[in-house]
Amino acid sequence: MQFSKMHGLGNDFMVVDAVTQNVFFSPELIRRLSDRHLGVGFDQLLVVEPPYDPELDFHYRIFNADGSEVSQCGNGARCFARFVRLKGLTNKRDIRVSTANGRMVLSVTEDELVRVNMGEPNFEPAQVPFRANKAEKTYIMRAAEQTILCGVVSMGNPHCVIQVDNVDTAAVETLGPVLESHERFPERANIGFMQVVRREHIRLRVYERGAGETRACGSGACAAVAVGIQQGLLAEEVRVELPGGRLDIAWKGPGHPLYMTGPAAHIYDGFIHL
């Protein structure tokens, strides 16, 4: 099987063309491939499939390193767009794809950044999903013998965003896994730790569902900005500084889609016998 290794701000992916190759990935195989000592090593596996709808260009599938399939990955979306152009699967700059729970438009700019229409953030608890009686801008949760204030949103996947004074000292390693699997998140969640530098600039670390802390989380950056705007903390255009680098997020508020712009890098191509 041929594959490419790519990364978006250090969030790394194994990307496989299932348009011209016949492939099947069991959870066991994905876990084996994701092993950084015995396999290829990656945070997520991205699979390019033929479109299910003739109006679209491709179907986009995402698997975490633990073998679970998820419906959204923002950094992966940027790598997906670069991959299909690099491999000659399309020459379009605006690429329309379906995911497990919707559609996306991936736009490759002249300087090879990728702008992704991530859709409108969804704050309805049932849609996240999150167990709550009604939608709130801020929720109170108990975890690890602490009372935690957080915002909750779906960007096509569930996110919990906590504001912290300093991301460098935030309890990502201890609070992250506890909140990820908290009983109020029936499908688990990605946990963002957000430091507001100013209205146009945040710092962020994300403990990702099924992957642990990563160098960058695109949908996590989108979620943090969406929650920050909803809570009145942030402007409509925000620079997000992650351990792996910078993303630019823009959202005009309810009724509008949120846009993420950032880089995607090709590392190498490989072949592996399965």
From Swiss-Prot:
Q: Which amino acids does the record list as binding substrate?
A: 11, 44, 64, 74-75, 157, 190, 208-209, 218-219
Cell compartment(s), UniProt: Cytoplasm
Quote one Gene Ontology molecular function term.
diaminopimelate epimerase activity
Active-site residues per Swiss-Prot or TrEMBL entry? 73 (proton donor), 217 (proton acceptor)
Site annotation (Important for dimerization): which residues? 268
Query: Which Pfam families does the record associate with it?
Result: DAP_epimerase
Family per UniProt? Belongs to the diaminopimelate epimerase family.
Per its record, how is this protein called by name?
Answer: Diaminopimelate epimerase
Instruction: Give the species.
Output: Salmonella typhimurium (strain LT2 / SGSC1412 / ATCC 700720)
